[in-house]
Amino acid sequence: MFRLQHVRTLFSISSLSLTSLLLCAAPRSNADSQPSPLVLELKLDGEVEPILANYIDEGLADAAKRKAALVLITMDTPGGLSDSMTDIIHHILDSPVPVVVYVAPDGARGASAGFLILLSADVAAMAPGTRTGAATPIFAPGWISMPIDEVLRKKINNDATAFLRSFTEKRGRNY
């Protein structure tokens, strides 16, 4: 009886070992051999200006061409030019690849134009210890802030508000 039990145990262990060996040696399925999804990272550091807008446009086009699964834009900006901000936002909204804008690292900001860029993304995220906001447009031709009358100020603010509303509603965000 003891000997029969011993033979059964030995047979079970041998069968299990052989099955494990065959499973390990078996070719992997297509799902396992697929490459990892491509995530393209772009840096939006410093003032928002035409060269940066062009860099973001080219990066998003490259991501689409390479069939990336996602574009991650890491942002730290005090803001910048309205035209460049608008270009970046249009590129993000038109991107066939989902875009995440992430304010990082600790201490970074997504202020002024950066705030609107953040809200235009498919996913807007912030690292702990970062800040955003202060998105009121200012009139500063040649980077020199100039006083403007109340009528022009209202026109500029209303235009910025309408633009913000257009894409926050598209993204399903509260306005």
Q: Language-model segments: what does each one mean?
A:
Residues 1-6:
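N-terminal secretory signal peptides that target proteins for export/translocation
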Residues 8-11, 37:
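Hydrophobic alpha-helical context, especially transmembrane and signal-peptide helices
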Residues 11-24:
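Bacterial N-terminal signal peptides
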Residues 26-175:
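Soluble extramembrane regions of membrane proteins in the secretory/endomembrane system
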